[in-house]
Structures are given as structure tokens and as C-alpha cells.
């Protein structure tokens, strides 16, 4: 299993990805992880990752606690299926992509800047791996 994090658009602050990169580097001990900023008109995630599970962050998505998020990662590991995560841009997700997602997930009922959502998602991925392996980070 490999984890891909895609973000639509670039952050305003060039240092905004540092925290997300740190958590993904830590998660990389358990599974290869890749993070990239994209433009929807230049990539088709279904062609690039035909068998991967597409999990997109959306305010109207399914609320999920950390234990359920870890279970989702575990399922991906057991199936050997890549996980593709996407955080939309300032205008949200492209409607056609939103409709095709395998799962829409909400990080919170609150609204956060996209830069913070990147860090929060990366941290939850790392936390999920730590939960599955009883790593002391989760305590």
C-alpha cells in the first residue's frame, strides 16, 4: 500500500507544508507516502491511480474519529490497496471529482485554512499507523 496526498492549489505561506511533510516522513516508516500539489485540469486521479481508494476531504463528508480513520488505513493495508487523499482548493472539490470519490470525509464541523487541513490530515495518517502498531505516540 502507498499513500498519496494531493492538494489543489498552492499554499499562501511557502512554509505551510513543513508540518505535513514531517508527519508524512514519520508515516513513511510504515508505508511509502507522497505529497503533491495539483491542478485538476492537468491530472486524472482515476487514470493515474485506477485501483486506489479515493478519499476526499469535504465539509459535508462523513465525520470520522481517529479510531475509524486508523481502521480505514488498516483496511487499505490488508487489501494492499493504495489510498489517495485529496484536499480541495479555496473553491472546494471539483463537482465531478466529488461525485466519483469512494469516500468523502470531514476533518471537523469547524472550518480551517487549507494549510492547516494539510497538517491535520498528515497527522491523522501518522496517528493511524501508530494506533495500528501500538506506538507510544498515541498515548
Swiss-Prot record:
Binding sites annotated in the UniProt record for S-adenosyl-L-methionine: 57, 88, 107-112
Ranges in a coiled coil: none
GO molecular function: rRNA (pseudouridine-N3-)-methyltransferase activity
EC number: 2.1.1.177
InterPro entries: Alpha/beta_knot_MTases, RlmH-like, tRNA_m1G_MTases_N
A GO CC term assigned to this protein in UniProt: cytoplasm
Keyword Chaperone among record annotations: no
CDD domains linked: RlmH-like
Reactions mediated catalytically: pseudouridine(1915) in 23S rRNA + S-adenosyl-L-methionine = N(3)-methylpseudouridine(1915) in 23S rRNA + S-adenosyl-L-homocysteine + H(+)
Subcellular location: Cytoplasm
Keywords from the UniProt entry: Cytoplasm, Methyltransferase, rRNA processing, S-adenosyl-L-methionine, Transferase
The family this protein is said to belong to: Belongs to the RNA methyltransferase RlmH family.
Function: Specifically methylates the pseudouridine at position 1915 (m3Psi1915) in 23S rRNA.
Quaternary structure note: Homodimer.
Protein's name according to its UniProt entry: Ribosomal RNA large subunit methyltransferase H
Gene behind the chain: rlmH
Amino acid at each position: 500500500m502507498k499513500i498519496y496526498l494531493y492538494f489543489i492549489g498552492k499554499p499562501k505561506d511557502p512554509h505551510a507544508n513543513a508540518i505535513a511533510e514531517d508527519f508524512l516522513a514519520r508515516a513513511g516508516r510504515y508505508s511509502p507516502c507522497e505529497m503533491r500539489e495539483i491542478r485538476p485540469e492537468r491530472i486524472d486521479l482515476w487514470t493515474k491511480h485506477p485501483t486506489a481508494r479515493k478519499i476526499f476531504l469535504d465539509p459535508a463528508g462523513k465525520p470520522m474519529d481517529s479510531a475509524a480513520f486508523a481502521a480505514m488505513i488498516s483496511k487499505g493495508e490488508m487489501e494492499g490497496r493504495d489510498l489517495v487523499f485529496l484536499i480541495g482548493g479555496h473553491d472546494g472539490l471539483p463537482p465531478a471529482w466529488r461525485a466519483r470519490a469512494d469516500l468523502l470525509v470531514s476533518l471537523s464541523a469547524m472550518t480551517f485554512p487549507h494549510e492547516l487541513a494539510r497538517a491535520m490530515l498528515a497527522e491523522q495518517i501518522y496517528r493511524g499507523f501508530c494506533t495500528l502498531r501500538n506506538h507510544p505516540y498515541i498515548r
